[in-house]
């Protein structure tokens, strides 16, 4: 791929429409982020063990037995779980949860996430009245610029590869299946970061850091979604839509960190910047 090819692409794009499309995308992304039970509403991160523990803001004592989360409700406590209204005194055992999966319970308006991350079973309450969510005023971004959009190619591995990466929480690791790499050119340099499977069939995402990380953008990671390659393996890599992961906003997230080859040596002055505040940090 040549620099001239990228310039031809830029010249063919209606810049005003490009900016409008980016603005509409950004507004919708912020709307999803501020959902009353989204990550900005998480009030704590709790790792379950055999030792029962009370969790602030939700009923019961919580523990782990044979890989299953258990909640022990006292007299007068109630919880909605597995389609049932549970009333104490009662012991409820949740089904086993697969890695990166989870189930939800409810206590009034508080949603209770029971999930498995990095081999650990965790509980995270999500309260729509949480102060951090109420005070959130948006994420700063770079202005959209076509110089940070490039055409690239997806190069599939012969077989998908399991890639182990670190996590925002010390001591955790995540294992993701990677179908291949995405190769593209930015400002005369070629990059081939490892890609992972996205939410939509055939789509991809890239975890990365760059020379702006820890300066104007979040230090640990950002993520870029990439639409499914076409029949010839072509993809569009648009860093204007690079976003923060939940760990940029809260200490109660277990987000994955980029593999070493995705630490890009160029400063990508595009996409979301470091959030203004972070939930759970000491003032």
Feature-to-residue mapping (PLM):
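Actinobacteria-biased recognition of intrinsically disordered, low-complexity terminal regions
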Residues: 1-16, 281-283
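N-terminal beta-hairpin/loop module of FHA
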Residues: 30-59
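Forkhead-associated
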Residues: 48-100
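Broad, structure-driven detector of short, well-ordered beta-strand segments within folded domains
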Residues: 59-67, 109-116, 191-195
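Protease-labile, long low-complexity intrinsically disordered regions enriched in Pro/Ser/Thr
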Residues: 78-124, 128
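Surface-exposed beta-loop interaction hotspot
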Residues: 108-178, 185
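Acidic/His-leaning functional-site neighborhoods
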Residues: 183-230, 240
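Extended, aromatic/histidine-rich regions of cofactor-dependent oxidoreductases associated
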Residues: 234-236, 242-283
């Amino acid at each position: 791929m040549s620099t001239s090819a990228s310039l031809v692409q830029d010249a063919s794009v209606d810049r005003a429409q490009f900016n409008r499309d980016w603005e509409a995308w950004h507004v919708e992304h912020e709307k999803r982020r501020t959902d009353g039970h989204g990550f900005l509403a998480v009030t704590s991160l709790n790792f379950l063990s055999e030792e029962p523990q009370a969790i602030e803001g939700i009923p019961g004592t919580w523990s782990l037995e044979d890989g299953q989360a258990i909640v022990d409700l006292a007299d007068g406590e109630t919880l909605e779980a597995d389609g049932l209204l549970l009333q104490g005194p009662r012991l409820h055992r949740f089904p086993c949860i697969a890695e990166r999966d989870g189930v939800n319970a409810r206590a009034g308006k508080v949603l209770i996430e029971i999930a498995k991350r990095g081999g650990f079973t965790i509980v995270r309450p999500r309260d729509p009245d949480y102060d951090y969510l109420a005070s959130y005023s948006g994420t700063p971004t770079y202005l959209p610029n076509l110089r940070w959009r490039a055409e690239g190619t997806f190069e599939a591995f012969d077989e998908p590869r399991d890639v182990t990466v670190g996590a925002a929480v010390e001591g955790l690791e995540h294992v993701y299946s990677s179908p291949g790499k995405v190769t593209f050119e930015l400002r005369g340099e070629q990059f081939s970061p490892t890609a992972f499977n996205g939410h939509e069939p055939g789509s991809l995402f890239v975890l990365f850091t760059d020379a702006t990380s820890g300066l104007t953008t979040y230090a640990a990671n950002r993520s870029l979604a990439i639409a499914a390659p076409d029949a010839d393996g072509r993809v569009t890599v648009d860093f204007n839509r690079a976003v923060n992961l939940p760990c940029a906003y809260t200490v109660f997230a277990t987000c994955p960190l980029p593999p070493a080859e995705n630490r890009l040596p160029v400063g990508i002055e595009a996409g979301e910047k470091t959030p203004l505040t972070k939930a759970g940090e000491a003032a």
